[in-house]
């Protein structure tokens, strides 16, 4: 699975695959292929969400409050 997909692109592709599978008229081998691709897309989305959670933890700090921002040279 190409990791260069954005979260939104991966979700869109995943929704498309789920829609195809929900129709129920997909041959078994094709359904298995869709399922595998869907699992890869799901993993990619999970990784991207974890990255964002880590970034938010840094921004919010340990106590869940926004950390004060000091621009370079503003340290008084």
Swiss-Prot record:
Alphabetized PANTHER family for the sequence: EXODEOXYRIBONUCLEASE 7 SMALL SUBUNIT
Q: Which gene encodes it?
A: xseB
Among Gene3D superfamilies, the record links this protein to:
Exonuclease VII, small subunit (1.10.287.1040)
Q: Matching Pfam families, A to Z?
A: Exonuc_VII_S
The UniProt entry's sequence similarity note says:
Belongs to the XseB family.
One GO CC term on file? exodeoxyribonuclease VII complex
GO BP annotation list = DNA catabolic process
Quaternary organization: Heterooligomer composed of large and small subunits.
Biological role = Bidirectionally degrades single-stranded DNA into large acid-insoluble oligonucleotides, which are then degraded further into small acid-soluble oligonucleotides.
Q: Upper lineage ranks?
A: Bacteria, Bacillati, Bacillota, Bacilli, Bacillales
Q: What is its EC number?
A: 3.1.11.6
Task: Report the principal subcellular site.
Answer: cytoplasm
Cellular location(s): Cytoplasm
What protein name does the entry list? Answer: Exodeoxyribonuclease 7 small subunit
């Amino acid at each position: 699975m190409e990791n260069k997909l954005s979260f939104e692109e991966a979700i869109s592709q995943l929704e498309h695959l789920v829609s195809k599978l929900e129709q129920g008229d997909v041959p078994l081998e094709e359904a298995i292929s869709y399922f595998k691709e869907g699992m890869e897309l799901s993993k990619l989305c999970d990784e991207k969400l974890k990255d964002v959670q880590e970034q938010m933890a840094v921004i919010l700090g340990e106590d869940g409050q926004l950390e004060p921002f000091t621009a370079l040279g503003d340290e008084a």
